[in-house]
């Protein structure tokens, strides 16, 4: 089942990459202002990265993944959606600092081809170093949240957290074996169990576009199976 989910993950990545081309971006190779150690991913995305490194004989890159005071989320995207839908104040994340991503090599990403959604969805219409932050179109921000929620649901038996924690967890052969069997891994410090999709966080002005996107995604098939068998696409 994990193998099939990996194919759906790649399909969602490809769909998003093509959709995002409708928005302007000033990002170029070597522009790494937003490449920090505060990247949040699912275990499914972590497995995608791990297999990529293994297939290319680059597992040694995992030895670089050491950092401190990085972001460890208190809630998953779908938990956040649940809080917002029910008008509950979500818990605040603990304090963290901004430091470069340990993967960065001479300002470039050695896993760019399989970079997680948190990375591929962060690009700016203006140079980040000028204002200190990325400028993203409001519609794309909504679409980014929708995809983040879908990816969490796709990895329904997995975990969510900082990429450093997720990859460290999966680098343990026993943990990886449990996950690949489709079982929910034991609780691990810094990682949160993925939650069901409670509804999408979408402002009224973006609803029609989101419905259109979800309809197109609903046609994705791999190995004779429809993506609807893994994720809920009803708005």
For each predicted feature, which ranges?
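Short loop/turn segments that flank or connect secondary-structure elements
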Residues: 1-235
